[in-house]
Amino acid sequence: MAAIIPPCSVNGVTLTIRKFTARHFGIEDLIQAGTMERWVANQLENYVLARKNVLIAGGTGTGKTTLLNVLGKFIPPDERILLIEDTSEIHMDHHNLVRFEARQAQNGVPPVSIRDLLKAALRHRPDRIILGEIRGGEAFDLLQLLNTGHSGSLSTVHATSARQALSRFTSCVLQSGVDLPYRAIKANIGDSVNVVIQLERRPGKRFVSEVVQVIRYDADLDEYDFGAVYQCPQEKP
């Protein structure tokens, strides 16, 4: 829930409630809804089982959290998942799931940030780390975990394309204040993020518009090499 009161809200109190459905969607639900084709769904399942690091990108309301929930169902039940969120909103039914949630400073109790939780993550010996959303400097801590060989991670980011998703990741890493060359950060991202799934929303429909594999970062050209897996036809409504 988010609220703005006058004078900042000119026409009176503005209240926005984000209501979560009690129903937890599966991959078949997304296929039936036209979110993706079956072969794309099968490929995404293969990426999770192969422990690829997957980044889900899209604008507000495109279904990033829903897809993250669905992909989490493909994680084998014998693997230990560490789920880290700023605000708890991911509902994952898994036998060995550990949930961490950031905390704001309140009544003299110090805050616990996403960055704090990511730094503590390895002490809990997770097989997979799921970060609800990349928003700021915590991207650097996530990147460090991925660079240490922690495979099979999932996360989301606000972006309008797969290419912009990696640019956004880079910008968030820089927000951490880390003293690393720009191209070194991009090279680390190119080595660590394996797959980007782009989501879009049109009237009455949310769908996967693009799936790419990240091959590498070319420092000479200052660009990423992508392997196209799926591109939504332009005429998609």
Model region roles, listed by residue range:
Residues I5-P7, I17-K19, G58, E101-A102, ...:
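Flexible glycine-/small-residue-rich
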Residues M1-A50:
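P-loop NTP-binding catalytic core
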Residues A41, V48-A57, V70-S192, Q198-R202:
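Switch/coupling sub-region of P-loop NTPases
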Residues G61:
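Walker A (P-loop) phosphate-binding loop of P-loop NTPases
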Residues A187-P237:
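Conserved P-loop NTPase
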